[in-house]
Amino acid sequence: MEIVSMRDMLKAGVHFGHQTRYWNPKMKPFIFGSRNKVHIINLEKTLPMFNFALSELKKISLKKGKILFVGTKRAASKKIKETALNCNQFYVNHRWLGGMLTNWKTVRQSIKRLKDLETESQDGTFSKITKKEALIRTRELSKLENSLGGIKNMGGLPDCLFVIDAAHENIAIKEANNLGIPVFAIVDTNSNPDGVDYVIPGNDDAIRSVTLYLQAVSLSICKNQNGNSFSEMLLDSDKKMNIE
């Protein structure tokens, strides 16, 4: 079943790529042409590729698979966290720490430290130590929560990655490739699609486009949707964006 329509994509500006001088020739099969020195993405390619990716994500979700959402740039950060939490999944929405997947043993130790500090902050330990020491631990807790808060309950490596902006998150993609973890990614005209198992050619900069991708994923894999159609969800999102 098609979740996203061509009309939804056009309204969200999914077809707008980057300036032609920044293009990656490997994206040529997905480019319709150019307008005012900006590449136009062929939505007749994007639409079926995205809907297929959504159906594959749904299969992973139904098997209780762990999906790690990755989007550390400003246009994606807030929505990535929102979507992952809404779907009881996991996220990295600030800086990707090198080795987050490939050096999981060390990451697991940092997660343990984060959880220990969380317990200390809640059980009164911070009030029993000096103010200076409490401040140091509070800062450490904040830093760890920022980096690892979205994966602290993942309990092991994810079953797949869903990435906004393949170029920006290339380290995460390389790590997933090394471990054989499937990668779903929004790939703009300036990006290299190599290493992405499920390529979704599209605008990765506009907040409306990013919102469309994530709401479509949410609709595919989350159980707690309120029954609204996809177009109604986008309309609600537009209203919220205008208020903000």
Curated annotation (Swiss-Prot):
One of its GO terms (cellular component) is cytosolic small ribosomal subunit. It comes from the Bacteria. GO terms for biological process: translation. The keyword Lipid biosynthesis does not apply. It holds the Pfam family Ribosomal_S2. Gene3D superfamilies: Glucose-6-phosphate isomerase like protein, domain 1 (3.40.50.10490), Helix hairpin bin (1.10.287.610). Keywords: Ribonucleoprotein, Ribosomal protein. One of its GO terms (molecular function) is structural constituent of ribosome. Belongs to the universal ribosomal protein uS2 family. HAMAP family: Ribosomal_uS2_B. This is Small ribosomal subunit protein uS2. It comes from Buchnera aphidicola subsp. Schizaphis graminum (strain Sg).
